[in-house]
A protein has these predicted regions:
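N-terminal, positively charged/glycine-rich alpha-helical extensions of SAM-dependent methyltransferases
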Residues: 1-21
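Conserved alpha-helix/loop element of class I SAM-dependent methyltransferases that forms part
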Residues: 27-48, 63
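Class I SAM-dependent methyltransferase SAM/SAH-binding core
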Residues: 49-106, 131
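A short acidic, Gly/Pro-enriched loop at the edge of an enzyme's catalytic core
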Residues: 104-115
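A short SAM/SAH-binding and catalytic strip from SAM-dependent methyltransferases
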Residues: 114-128
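A short glycine-rich, Lys/Arg-flanked "PGG" loop and its adjoining helix->strand segment in the class I
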Residues: 130-142
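Conserved catalytic/acceptor-binding region of the Class I
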Residues: 141-209, 216-230
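C-terminal lobe and adjacent flexible extensions of AdoMet/dcAdoMet transferase-like proteins
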Residues: 209-280
Length: 280
């Protein structure tokens, strides 16, 4: 077994259950998605086919439709209930195509997509980022663009450290360092990747509220090595005592959000008219 594996069926169940109340609980996701969309506006790019990978309830795909009114839009998600929410949100006019599946094995043809837009999804399929990004590269056209956000390694650090003081089991998902993400993009064939980080802080009145908020957005522990069973009152008390608390009695949660983008190499003709793939 790998050092850290994600339980795909558990991820799907988590987001299937979270779909109904997702918009009310996922303020952070909505904020990050909005920022990524704003950054996309600054790029001089006119894609014909756009894939919203990990569409959730459709915030991204609705805005992408406004930004690229002539593009074919595809909303992709692991959870069917999320896609149903997306369909309702998108309305009847120019409804996007809906695809349900695993991002590691996209049901799309080679060189078929101009833009992959993905906000806070990659962390749920991050065991082998080179393989994941290689799959994205497969479906992207030459000169295609990958624009994404994902959680960085310092996400939920307070909760992780508190659990480490309680026992040695896996209670918190592992997130990947920004530099490793950039290296994986290069290894998968993307050129000139650009990476940066934003930090978001949320505060709660108790550790129970912290864990409830994480679960409500579908982001609780989904590692195959995760601790099983219900948490007893004594363990919860130990966790609360180990969790750093401010003088005002507030429990902070850090989210490190990594923003990334990378282009596929262009195809340029030789003098004889033969096209070759340029890797710079």
């Amino acid at each position: 077994m790998a050092e850290f594996e994600l339980d795909r069926s558990q991820i799907r169940r988590s987001f299937e259950r979270a779909a109904v109340g997702y918009d009310a609980a996922a303020g952070l996701q909505q904020e990050v998605c909005g920022t990524l969309l704003e950054r996309l506006e600054w790029i001089n790019f006119s894609p014909k086919v756009v894939l919203d990978l990990g569409t959730g309830t459709g915030q991204g795909v609705v805005q992408l439709r406004k930004q690229y009114p002539k593009a074919q839009l595809i909303a992709f998600d692991l959870a069917e209930s999320m896609l149903k929410r997306t369909s309702k949100r998108a309305g009847w006019f120019r409804k996007p195509g809906l695809l349900c599946g695993d991002a590691r094995r996209l049901p799309l043809a080679d060189n078929s997509v101009d833009l992959i837009f993905s906000s806070l999804t990659i962390q749920w399929c991050s065991e082998d980022l080179v393989a994941l990004f290689s799959e994205f590269a497969r479906v992207l056209k030459p000169a295609g663009l990958l624009m994404f956000t994902t959680f960085g390694m310092d996400t939920l650090q307070q909760l992780r450290q508190a659990w480490a003081a309680v026992d040695e089991q896996v209670h918190v998902n592992r997130f990947v360092d920004m530099h490793d993400i950039g290296d994986a993009l290069l290894a998968a064939g993307f050129k000139d990747p650009v990476m940066d980080v934003e930090r978001h802080l949320r505060e709660f009145g108790s550790v129970t509220e912290v864990m409830r908020s994480i679960k409500a957005m579908g982001a609780h522990n989904v590692a195959t090595q995760r601790a099983r069973g219900l948490m007893g009152r004594q363990k919860l008390q130990r966790l609360q005592e180990a969790y750093p608390c401010s003088e005002a009695g507030r429990f902070a949660v850090d989210y490190e959000v990594v923003f990334g983008m990378g282009w596929m190499p262009e195809v340029e003709p030789l003098d004889g008219g033969v096209e070759v793939l340029l890797r710079r």
